[in-house]
Structures are given as C-alpha cells and as structure tokens.
Amino acid sequence: MNTEATHDQNEALTTGARLRNAREQLGLSQQAVAERLCLKVSTVRDIEEDKAPADLASTFLRGYIRSYARLVHIPEEELLPGLEKQAPLRAAKVAPMQSFSLGKRRKKRDGWLMTFTWLVLFVVIGLSGAWWWQDHKAQQEEITTMADQSSAELSSNSEQGQSVPLNTSTTTDPATTSTPPASVDTTATNTQTPAVTAPAPAVDPQQNAVVSPSQANVDTAATPAPTAATTPDGAAPLPTDQAGVTTPVADPNALVMNFTADCWLEVTDATGKRLFSGMQRKDGNLNLTGQAPYKLKIGAPAAVQIQYQGKPVDLSRFIRTNQVARLTLNAEQSPAQ
C-alpha cells in the first residue's frame, strides 16, 4: 500500500517539482546546480517551475532536464512521460539559404560589369591608336607629296635652265659671225689698254644682243674713255670684270637657315615666287632674299634653325607636336600659322 501510494504521489508531481524535491533532499541550491550543469540560474528556475523558455529549443531543454535528473539521482525513465508533456518536440523551421545564390548572382553581375569595363577600355585604346596612326600617315604622305612636287619642279627648272644657255650660245647671228675680229679687238683694248678706242661704243649694240646682262653691265661701266685715259702709265689697269663688281649690301629681309639633319622645305615670298623647294642635307645652310612676307613649309622643324632680320625664329610649338611647320614671316618677324 505504501509503495503504490508513493508511486501515485510521484506521478502526481510534475517533472520540475520532482527535480526540486530531489535537490532539496540533497541539500543543493539552485546556484550550485547551475554551476555544476554550466547553466544559468534562471534556466534552472524555469525547469523547476515547468516553464519552457521561448528562446530555447525543445531539444536543448530536454537535454538540460536529463542532466539535472542524473545530478539529483532520478532515473530518466521516470521523467520521460513528463518530458513529452513539458517539452514536446517541435519541428524546426529551416530557412532557405539565399546567401549563396545571392552571392552567386552578385558575382555574375560583377563579372559582366568588369567585362564591359575592359571592353570599353580596349575600344578607347584602339580608337586612340588608330587616330594617331592616321594622323602620322597623313603627315608622312603630305611630306612625300610635297617632296615629289618639289623634285619634279626642280627637274623641270633645271631642264629649262640648261636649254637656255645652249640656245643662246649655239645661235648664230649673221651680224655677230660676220664681225668676230671687231669684238675680239674691242675686248682686247678694254682689258689690256688703259685707254678705250673710239670704235668701242659702236660695238656695244652687237654685244648686247649676245652677252648676258652681267657682261652688259661690265661694258657700260668700262665705256667712259676720259677716266681711263687719265690713268697714269705706271698704274695697273683693272679688268673689266672687276670694274663691274660692286660691294654687296646686306638685305634686311634676308632669310638664313642652318640644317642639323636632312629636311624638306619650301619658301615663297610675297609675290608668289618660289625661292626654294626641295631637300636640304645635314650641315647645309641656305640664304634667301625676296619680298617679305615669306611663307615657309618645313617637313622636319627640329632639323632647321632659322634667322630672320638677324633674330632667331621660334619653332618650338611645331617641334613639340611633331607636325609639318607652316608659318609666315612678315616684316616685323612675327611668325604666324
């Protein structure tokens, strides 16, 4: 009778009450139980009061109760029916893992962005290179074209220049061929005797028809007879070629160019006359005179040094850009594009 009454009494008690009674019989406090089970005092109190914390999973709660029962020497089989009521097993809700898929989509989007960025960068670099190459090629073609034109013009001018002296020297005029002794005599008297004879002025029209303008100037300078007649006998007579030479006067509009490398250039003056067009070699120099302003086209500005009116001309802007120099030098030496 006593055993059945005790069994009925144990069944009437809840799990928490049985654990509390067993703890009190062993003389343990809630603090001591919490320290031995490595739990909070509040968790031990909730177990003894048959409370199931909302933030605690049923699996952990059942484990705590079993550990508590072993500590106070209560068989676990006696607590199983009460555990089913106090801490029923609940199906845990497993949240779908979205972080991996989101990271994968983000990584894919970043990959497309990087690919597009590199594509744009390659396109920009390609366009820049193509633009530079076309500009460089156009400059080279322009230089080649100007050089070809200048060489063709120089060849045509040289052919014309060679044909003119041949025609004038080989043409036979009856007037000139009929009187060779007279022309020889007059030149002999002009160059060897201090006094000029009387027939010399009569020969001038024939000489003007044959000789060049420089020789005509020499003859006119040698015609004054009284001056030559008053020359002393001991003085040496000057040749007619030296008598016609005058001291050159420096032209204020002279254009001086010194070349440090091979360079093609073209120079024209205000009248449109082409003073020079062609290739100049290294260590060469060029002195040009004409009517200002001058128009210059220089294929390699870095290879030439220009002085105009005794002052150097600045070509640094063309050298920096490595372009064909096109400039105009006016009377005030202000180069303009």
Swiss-Prot record:
Protein name, UniProt field: Cytoskeleton protein RodZ
Alphabetical list of SUPFAM superfamilies matching this protein: lambda repressor-like DNA-binding domains
InterPro entries per record: Bact_Cytoskel_RodZ, Cro/C1-type_HTH, Lambda_DNA-bd_dom_sf, RodZ, RodZ-like_C
Lineage, uppermost ranks: Bacteria, Pseudomonadati, Pseudomonadota, Gammaproteobacteria, Enterobacterales
Domain notes: The helix-turn-helix (HTH) motif in the cytoplasmic domain of the N-terminus is involved in the formation of spirals to maintain the rigid rod shape. As this protein is anchored in the cytoplasmic membrane, the HTH motif may contribute to protein-protein interactions to form the RodZ helix, which is localized beneath the cytoplasmic membrane. The C-terminal domain may be critical for determination of the rod shape by probably interacting with enzymes required for synthesis of the peptidoglycan layer, including PBPs in the periplasm.
Residue ranges flagged as DNA-binding region: 30-49
Membrane topology: Single-pass type II membrane protein
Segments of this protein annotated with the region Disordered: 145-236
